[in-house]
Structure formats: structure tokens, C-alpha cells
Curated annotation (Swiss-Prot):
Protein name (database record): tRNA 5-methylaminomethyl-2-thiouridine biosynthesis bifunctional protein MnmC
Record keywords, A-Z: Cytoplasm, FAD, Flavoprotein, Methyltransferase, Multifunctional enzyme, Oxidoreductase, S-adenosyl-L-methionine, Transferase, tRNA processing
EC number: 2.1.1.61, 1.5.-.-
Gene3D superfamilies noted in UniProt: D-Amino Acid Oxidase, subunit A, domain 2, FAD/NAD(P)-binding domain, Vaccinia Virus protein VP39
Catalytic activity: 5-aminomethyl-2-thiouridine(34) in tRNA + S-adenosyl-L-methionine = 5-methylaminomethyl-2-thiouridine(34) in tRNA + S-adenosyl-L-homocysteine + H(+)
Pfam families (UniProt xref): DAO, Methyltransf_30
One Gene Ontology term from the biological process aspect of the record: methylation
UniProt GO MF annotations: oxidoreductase activity, acting on the CH-NH group of donors; tRNA (5-methylaminomethyl-2-thiouridylate)(34)-methyltransferase activity
Length: 609
């Protein structure tokens, strides 16, 4: 059977017994192929009543898996074929780099790393519990021929290990002995055909090793320390996209999360936008912003599919991007993996998950430390909540609260000048119902560029009986006097004329007649247009964290930032490569961190939207 070798590989790693009653298990595979080992491991996890809460599977592949070959390869195994059919749709549109795919309610996380084996290993920032090693000359034909496995590849593997990590190689791997031994692995061999697998099945496993170096393990290259900490209680300040996504990611990992907001209901600020677009940023040099948005959009669409009602709360319509800022003749871009989405509905869905409690009308004015816990205080000094960790996800309000905290507790060493500069930017959306105009007036899909038009959005519970269109959005720093609604409407109409001249002409009468509604709020934007995610103080186990500054890209960034924060709390594989993760560091203004970024060739300068 096709799964025999993979099941044997699982057995030689001591699984599923080794992960029994663990919070999480982390597996690294050096050659994904068509996913046989992943599917077999996932099946074993599903079938085990004592499975860990989280299964992390990181796999390197030279190219995205071929969906037809993946399904054909599992045809002889009905159980694996069912799982392959869940995997296949998420393999659409994979590109070079890290791709995070989620299954079983976010409890099975597959991180596919598409690219050169050694480069992908060096971009990791976690310690695996098990490693499936399959050398393949095609991974790097000029350097890693099976007969000459290079020591630096073994070193890259060692960097992904903790003491006790088990490694198995389901091939003839004699040529790996010297390099792996030199890097701290203690090896044993298994003769091909020896019955060690399930039900005494023959096996082709030829190498088994355990990482147990004679020296003290030091990980000086770990610039984003990922030390797993005991699951406990957490308070999140802010119930918008940033706060709700953090709460959902932590609750899936067993945290008890209290979300506090000064408003009576969630998504009362900029996250209350009636509708937004989930679409990646594109740049000629594939800058940091583009790469981050690609990863974030994939994660967000996975959340929408699992939590929201398609056609009512969101729809995967695709989005047409007009290249209005380019030279004449630059073609438009069609984004098939893009959607419109109602942020408020997503926030509510996140906050409805088990382990999360929402507390409205709760303005946090100060914090007080009591032993290992933090007390969140209201304006009168009364305690709103107590938790072992606090996440500031309250947009622009975070900086004012941090100023107060630093003044009260100077020993915390929270230097506000190390955080990216944040400012509020007002935005107004113009919208109206589909009345008085034929349906063919509107494009069948959203269009974005310098602004956006979302033409078909249901605004009731009748799934399309009452439809509205939305055009936006204006962009004005809150340091300036607010512009009147009429001026912002005119700005939005001018943008619409550029995006879709025909539609702009058709809707001009509604704007002129004052038959257009306005929705407005203030975004929180960082100077470099990237969110701020990370600890606020430099200690071994920081209790204060930030996840803020999403700007106009909350739908692209929020789930990515939440998963990045949760991964760092839990010692998990990161959803993006370590180089990209460093660009989001909350304290990225610190001198030591700035110097490290300046030396890194992996981090091109971010580009503005």
C-alpha cells in the first residue's frame, strides 16, 4: 500500500506514542513530494484520542505539489484520498517561500516551504520534535548530490533541532552518517526489510538518529526567540480585527482570553468598515509589503471559508487591479485568489470561539503589575481584569497607554521611541443601494487601484435581495482638520472615474443629488506601512505584547500577525520566514535590532501601498 513506508517512518519516530498528551508536536520534512508523509501523519493524528492540541508540519519542496499527481497517488488508500481532497484546493496558487495551510479548525498547520532546501531550512525559527529526512539530488543538483551530502545542510538541520529530536531517513542514507554525526546526531541503522513498522511490516528505513550533541546548544542566530510557555490567561485590549484575530489564534492553542474594548460592541472602530477587499499587494521588486500581504491573504481566505457565510458575509469573486500609477499601457492584474469581506462579521465569528470572553464598555486607562500577573485598570483605578499576559491591539490608543505605563513603571524599560511611528488617518467610504440603475451598470467583481469599488454587497440577511455598492476610501491624516463629507464624496467619485469611467459616469447623478451615504472612521498607520507585532520589553518571558498598526490592510495582515504572535508564544514554526517576521518586530526602532536588519540581505526596504 502507498502509505506503508510513511507509516513506518512515523513509527520509527516513536509516533504516535511520543506526542501523547502533548500540547503540540512539530515535524520537519525535507522533501514534501506529493504529501504522503504529511497525509499519513495527519491521519494518525486524527485517529489518536490522546493527540496533541496542535500538529505542526513543516515541509520543504522544490516546487508546489501537482494536484492531479497528489490525488492520483492516494487513489489506492480511501482514507488518505479523503485527506488529499482537503489538501488539494489549498495548493492552488502556491508561490516561492513559506505557505501556511490550515486544517481541522486550525489545529493542523502545514507550512509548505517552496524553494532551495538549505535556504528554506535556514529561514526556520523553531525546534522540531521529529524530522523526516529524504535527500534528493534534484533539490539542489549542483551542491547536494546524494553521494556528497554537504555538512552545511546537516548544520541547517541541526539548527532546527532540540536535544532529543528524532530523525529518520526512509532511504539508503549511509553517505549522511559522517555529516550528521559531526553536527551532533547519534545514529543507529535499521536494515532494509527488518520488520519494525506497524504490524511488523517490512520497511525501507535505513537510518535513525537522535540529536544529542556533546556540546551546549546555543542558538545565536535566533533573532525571534520562540520559547514555548505554559498556556494560561491573556487579556487583549481592543476588539477590532487585530485584537479578535489574536484572541482566536491564542484560544485555539488553549489560552483563556479576555478581550476588552472601550466600545459597547466589537469592531466599533476602523474594523467596522462595512466591506473591504482581501487582495494581495503587487510590486515590481516583490517587496516586503507584497510578500507579507500574499501570506496574509492566504490565511484570511482560509478563515473566511471556515467561519463565514459565502455570498452573505464574504465572496471569493476575485478582484481586478487597475495599474493607474504605472506608465501608459501597463496591463491590469486579475487576482483570482481575492475576495470582498465584511470585517464586522469576521470579528464576531472570531470572538465567538471557545475560550474567548468579550468585555465591552471597558476602557483600560492603566496597568498595574502584581507578581507574575497584570491588572488592567479603568479610569477610576478599578480593576477590569487580571491576566498573565497582555496584548495591546487597540490601534492608536496603544501608544498613549504605553506612555502612561512607562511613567508608572520605568523599570519595565518600555522605550516608546523604539516602536514605529504611528498616526491616525481618516477614511470615508461612499455607498448607496442598487436602485434606479440596471444591473449591467455594475461590474461583476470588485475593482481596486487608487481606491476601490465593491459593487455587489448584500446589506441584509436575504443573501442578495438588498444589494449595495461601496466606493472608497478617502485618506486624510487626523492631524489635519476633518474634511466635510461632501468633499470626501467628491474625492471618492474622482477615484471611481479612474477605476471605472463608465460606472463613475452612471453614479455621478447620485453623488450630485446627495443620495450617497457615508461611513467614516480612523485607521492606525505606521510610518513604514507595516504592522507592529512583538514583545514590548526585552526579558526572557515578556508579559506585554503589541499587535497593532494594520492601517488599510487589516484584512490582509490581521490573521498573519495573530499567528505570528501565537507561534512566538508557543515555540512553534513561524507562518512566514524569519527574515520577513523581523520586519514586523514591534521594537524595530531599537538600535541593536536596526543594526541586525541592516546586515540582513533578506530584507528589502518596504514599499508604500
Amino acid at each position: 500500500m502507498v502509505e506503508l513506508a510513511a507509516a513506518t517512518c512515523l513509527h520509527e519516530c516513536g509516533l504516535p506514542q511520543a506526542w501523547c498528551k502533548q500540547e503540540a508536536w512539530r515535524i520537519l520534512e525535507t522533501r514534501f513530494g506529493q504529501g504522503l508523509h504529511f497525509l499519513t501523519t495527519w491521519q494518525a493524528w486524527r485517529n489518536d484520542p490522546q493527540r496533541p492540541r496542535m500538529l505542526h508540519y513543516v515541509a520543504v519542496t522544490a516546487a508546489p505539489p501537482d494536484i492531479d499527481e497528489l490525488l492520483a497517488g492516494m487513489a489506492s488508500s480511501p482514507e488518505l484520498l479523503l485527506l488529499a481532497k482537503e489538501l488539494a484546493p489549498q495548493c492552488l496558487g502556491l508561490s516561492t517561500g513559506f505557505q501556511r495551510l490550515t486544517f481541522d479548525g486550525g489545529h493542523v498547520l502545514l507550512t509548505l516551504c517552496v524553494g532551495d532546501l538549505t535556504a528554506m531550512l535556514r529561514a526556520q525559527q523553531f525546534a522540531a520534535d521529529s524530522i523526516y529526512l529524504t535527500p534528493d539530488p534534484t533539490d539542489c543538483p549542483d551542491r547536494c548530490a546524494a553521494s556528497n551530502w554537504r555538512v552545511w545542510t546537516a548544520k541547517a538541520l541541526a539548527r532546527c533541532c532540540r536535544r532529543g529530536t528524532t530523525l529518520v531517513a526512509p532511504v539508503d542514507a549511509d553517505h549522511l552518517y559522517a555529516d550528521l554525526t559531526q553536527c551532533g546526531f547519534e545514529l543507529s541503522t535499521i536494515q532494509a526489510g527488518q520488520p519494525t513498522g506497524p504490524e511488523a511490516a517490512p520497511t525501507n528505513i535505513s537510518l535513525r538518529a537522535q540529536f544529542n550533541p556533546r556540546w551546549t546548544i546555543k542558538n545565536t542566530r535566533n533573532t525571534l526567540p520562540a520559547r514555548a510557555m505554559a498556556v494560561s490567561s491573556c487579556a487583549v485590549i481592543g476588539a477590532g480585527l487585530a485584537g479578535a484575530s489574536v484572541a482566536a489564534s491564542l484560544a485555539r492553542r488553549g489560552w483563556q482570553v479576555q478581550v476588552l474594548d472601550q466600545a459597547h460592541t466589537p469592531a466599533a472602530g476602523a474594523s467596522g468598515l462595512p466591506v473591504g477587499l482581501v487582495v494581495p499587494h503587487v510590486s515590481a521588486d516583490d517587496c516586503v509589503l507584497s510578500r507579507l500581504s500574499r501570506s496574509g491573504v492566504r490565511l484570511m481566505l482560509q478563515q473566511a471559508r471556515s467561519l463565514l457565510r459565502q455570498g452573505q458575509d464574504w465572496d471569493a469573486t476575485g478582484v481586478l487591479e487597475r495599474r493607474l500609477d504605472g506608465p501608459p499601457g501597463v496591463p491590469d492584474i486579475w487576482h483570482p485568489q481575492a475576495a470582498w469581506l465584511k470585517p464586522t462579521q469576521l470579528v464576531r465569528a472570531w470572538l465567538a470561539q471557545l475560550g474567548i470572553t468579550f468585555q465591552g464598555d471597558a476602557k483600560v486607562a492603566a496597568l498595574r503589575q502584581r507578581g507574575d500577573e497584570w491588572e488592567l485598570l479603568d479610569t477610576d483605578g478599578g480593576m477590569l481584569h487580571r491576566a498573565s499576559r497582555v496584548v495591546f491591539a487597540n490601534a492608536g490608543g496603544a501608544m498613549a497607554l504605553l506612555d502612561t505605563l512607562q511613567a508608572r513603571l520605568p523599570a519595565l524599560n518600555i522605550r516608546v521611541n523604539q516602536f514605529p511611528v504611528m498616526q491616525g488617518v481618516r477614511g470615508q467610504v461612499s455607498w448607496a443601494m442598487h436602485t434606479g440603475l440596471p444591473d449591467e451598470t455594475f461590474p461583476p467583481f470588485p475593482i481596486n487601484g487608487a481606491g476601490s469599488i465593491v459593487p455587489w454587497v448584500p446589506v441584509d440577511e436575504d443573501c442578495g435581495q438588498n444589494l449595495a455598492w461601496f466606493v472608497g476610501a478617502s485618506y486624510q491624516p487626523d492631524s489635519q482638520p476633518p474634511a466635510p463629507d461632501e468633499k470626501n464624496h467628491a474625492t471618492n467619485l474622482a477615484r471611481l472615474h479612474k477605476l471605472s469611467p463608465k460606472l463613475g459616469q452612471a453614479l455621478a447623478g447620485k453623488f450630485a443629488a446627495g443620495a450617497v451615504n457615508a461611513w467614516k472612521n480612523t485607521r492606525c498607520v505606521t510610518a513604514d506601512r507595516l504592522p507592529a507585532v512583538g514583545p514590548l520589553d526585552q526579558v526572557d518571558h515578556p508579559g506585554l505584547w503589541m499587535c497593532a498598526g494594520m492601517g488599510s490592510r487589516g484584512l490582509s495582515f490581521s490573521m498573519l500577525c495573530a499567528e505570528l504572535l501565537a507561534a512566538r508564544w508557543s515555540g512553534e514554526p513561524l507562518p512566514i520566514d524569519a527574515g520577513l517576521a523581523r520586519t514586523l518586530e514591534a521594537r524595530r526602532g531599537a538600535d541593536c535590532h536596526r543594526n541586525r536588519l541592516d546586515r540582513s540581505p533578506e530584507l528589502p526596504v518596504s514599499c508604500a501601498p
